[in-house]
Amino acid sequence: MNELNAFNEQRAEIYWWLSSLFAHELTKEQLEQYNSFEIRTFLTNLSETPELTDSISSIVTKLNELQTREDAQLELSADFCEAFLGSDKNSALPYASMYLDKSRLLNAKPAQDMRDLLEKYNITQKAEFNEPADHIAIELDFLGNLIVMTNQQTTEPEFEQFMAAQLQFINEQLLSWAPRFNQLCSERDTFGFYAAVTHFLVTFLELDVKFLAGE
């Protein structure tokens, strides 16, 4: 495996990690894993990229605070519900349609566009995650899969075509609304763990665009 393929695999893992955080509340077992050597090393390695240092530091700070927070898992689940599962007036709803479509209704054109992309690349939405296709977790999972598919291409033109598809997807399907999503989450997540995660998401997307554009 060459260095670029290895780097792509790391990128895919980051997007899948983020997808998992937006898909469901963390269980008690998952929350405990965030204090493990493996995950703390993962976060430390990410923080060594200067552009990511501050956003990873915010996540680590909140993880450390959770260790002394009473009923941490229950409270963090409540934070998740407060941040993402309320109404559009008091939550940061994780659907592109709420930000990109004038109707501000679920399952609008951005969701159809995402369904078309899933079909185009023959990527199946997880059956147990019954959400509109433009949910942030589905979009991030798709991107992780698209990156892995890039590594599977056998010719340089095909590889470059898939790299270009990643760049287009991030710009059109994610950075078109993720900054506003992050802003709302920072306003509506009182404790701040998910606000830190959305801030890292936007920071990483912006950095990834520079990588894909060859800057």
UniProtKB/Swiss-Prot annotation:
One GO CC term, this protein: cytoplasm
Entry similarity comment: Belongs to the TorD/DmsD family. TorD subfamily.
InterPro entries hit by this protein: Chaperone_TorD (IPR023069), DMSO/NO3_reduct_chaperone (IPR020945), HscB_C_sf (IPR036386), TorD-like_sf (IPR036411), TorD/DmsD_chaperones (IPR050289)
Record's protein name: Chaperone protein TorD
Keyword Chaperone: yes
Gene Ontology biological process terms, A to Z: protein complex oligomerization; protein folding
Function: Involved in the biogenesis of TorA. Acts on TorA before the insertion of the molybdenum cofactor and, as a result, probably favors a conformation of the apoenzyme that is competent for acquiring the cofactor.
SUPFAM superfamilies: TorD-like
Gene3D superfamilies the UniProt entry points to: 1.20.120.1820, HscB, C-terminal domain
Main location: cytoplasm
Superkingdom of source: Bacteria
Subcellular location: Cytoplasm
Key words, A-Z: Chaperone, Cytoplasm
